[in-house]
């Protein structure tokens, strides 16, 4: 696979399932526009999007309940969505799957550090030389529960630093903890 030329210099919203995804809805209701919207996993069953990133094998949703509340919405989406849905392996039961260009992205970035779906989407943006990334719903830890945090924040922040270094503008939802965006100035 080669980079997608039409993405070069474009503004992309990447929307995950964390609480700050509501900031995406607010942005849209206030007429913010994006050249493309990329959905992470089950968010694709809720919002209009151009691409889906799901780095789990489709069998996780088709054959098990391992994804909990995401299972049913992903099951329907995978069987009907025409793509592109970037994933780690193809499955003939899902017409829209495209194998994520892992070799190409790793070779381009000279880096193997990818451990969650959002990081793969950010790395894909870097590889495609987008002009701006606006992130919503990538919240990895939560102010109301100091003892819980999802894995993957450091990896996403690492890839965002690589994007910034490459001249890509990075904007984070105001209520997200990513890059400490939601930390009050007095803290």
PLM regions and their residue ranges:
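Metal-ion/cofactor- or nucleotide/acyl-coenzyme-handling active-site neighborhoods
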Residues: 1-187
């Amino acid at each position: 696979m080669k980079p997608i030329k039409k993405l070069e210099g474009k503004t992309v919203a990447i929307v995950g399932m964390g609480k700050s995804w509501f900031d995406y809805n607010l942005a849209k209701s206030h007429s913010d526009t994006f050249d493309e919207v990329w959905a992470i996993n089950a968010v694709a069953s809720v919002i209009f999007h151009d691409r889906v990133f799901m780095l789990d094998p489709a069998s996780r949703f088709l054959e098990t309940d391992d994804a909990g509340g995401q299972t049913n919405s992903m099951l329907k989406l995978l069987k009907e969505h025409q793509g592109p849905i970037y994933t780690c392996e193809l499955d003939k039961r899902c017409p829209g799957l495209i194998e994520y260009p892992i070799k190409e992205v790793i070779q381009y970035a000279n880096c193997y550090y990818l451990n969650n779906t959002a990081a793969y989407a950010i790395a894909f943006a870097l590889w495609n030389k987008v002009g701006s990334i606006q992130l919503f719903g990538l919240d990895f830890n939560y102010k109301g529960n100091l003892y819980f945090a999802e894995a993957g924040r450091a990896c996403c922040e690492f890839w965002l630093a690589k994007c910034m270094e490459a001249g890509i503008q990075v904007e984070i939802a105001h209520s997200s903890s990513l890059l400490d965006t939601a930390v009050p100035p007095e803290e």
